[in-house]
């Protein structure tokens, strides 16, 4: 059995989500072969050199799960794309490229965070290209901590404002893009997060049935996708 989650947006200001996640790690996740976290694990991440005691505690909890033999994979999201190898070492997890094709219960599956699929949001896509540029990342990682914190607050506030102002379809995945993405990677299943719109979308690629599974975000409730010999099953659960 394999579990996939995304968009927890962990932060000290949401202890209810943190408690639910720690409970998830100590119970359901212990039964899994692997746990995949597909981005926006943290609400903000300004660098491994700026880890807070809160973030350190999350790393320890993940490491405890890895010591039980559960493989943990972490993918960058748009909020935490500066997570590096120092955190992954402390957490006992492996950083997973976006996109990645992995084997889930014998089937090749494409995993993505999902923000790169929202191509109608042209302003965000320009910002994404700028921030993910290797030179930009080098500069960001070498800014003083105070500057990084200020910049992170500014970007987060602007993101929230823009999300409220933009039309719903603009900040969602561009559906016409999906068949081509699946065909390019030679898979029939795509799993991603980012949009906070949990659902399974059936489609057709080269005359064959395919599907796009969107992971739910942890806010009013938690979400996890379970993959096993019976297929794919995603369901919400209470945070408390």
UniProtKB/Swiss-Prot annotation:
InterPro entries per the UniProt record, alphabetical: Calcineurin-like_PHP_ApaH, LpxH-like, Metallo-depent_PP-like, UDP-diacylglucosamine_Hdrlase
UniProt source species: Stutzerimonas stutzeri (strain A1501)
Question: Which membrane topology term applies here?
Answer: Peripheral membrane protein
Q: List the keywords (alphabetical).
A: Cell inner membrane, Cell membrane, Hydrolase, Lipid A biosynthesis, Lipid biosynthesis, Lipid metabolism, Manganese, Membrane, Metal-binding
Name of this protein: UDP-2,3-diacylglucosamine hydrolase
Pathway assigned in UniProt: Glycolipid biosynthesis; lipid IV(A) biosynthesis; lipid IV(A) from (3R)-3-hydroxytetradecanoyl-[acyl-carrier-protein] and UDP-N-acetyl-alpha-D-glucosamine: step 4/6
Where it mainly occurs, coarsely classed, is membrane
The entry's localization annotation reads: Cell inner membrane
């Amino acid at each position: 059995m394999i579990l996939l989650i995304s968009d927890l947006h962990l932060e000290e200001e949401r202890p209810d989500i943190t408690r639910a996640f720690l409970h998830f790690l100590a119970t359901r996740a212990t039964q899994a072969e692997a746990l995949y976290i597909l981005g926006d694990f943290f609400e903000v991440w300004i660098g491994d050199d700026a880890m807070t005691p809160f973030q350190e505690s999350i790393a320890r909890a993940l490491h405890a799960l890895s010591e039980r033999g559960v493989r943990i994979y972490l993918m960058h999201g748009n909020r935490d794309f500066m997570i590096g190898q120092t955190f992954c070492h402390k957490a006992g997890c492996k950083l997973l490229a976006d996109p990645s094709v992995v084997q889930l219960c014998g089937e090749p599956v494409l995993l993505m965070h999902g923000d790169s699929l929202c191509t109608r949001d042209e302003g965000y896509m320009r910002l994404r290209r700028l921030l993910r540029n290797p030179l930009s990342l080098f500069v960001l990682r070498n800014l003083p901590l105070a500057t990084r914190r200020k910049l992170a607050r500014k970007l987060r506030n602007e993101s929230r404002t823009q999300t409220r102002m933009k039309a719903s379809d603009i900040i969602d995945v561009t559906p016409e893009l999906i068949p081509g993405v699946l065909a390019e990677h030679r898979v029939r299943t795509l799993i991603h997060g980012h949009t906070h719109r949990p659902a399974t979308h059936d489609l057709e690629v080269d005359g064959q049935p395919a599907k796009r599974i969107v992971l739910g975000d942890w806010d009013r409730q938690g979400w996890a996708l379970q993959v096993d010999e019976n297929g794919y099953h995603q369901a919400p659960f209470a945070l408390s």
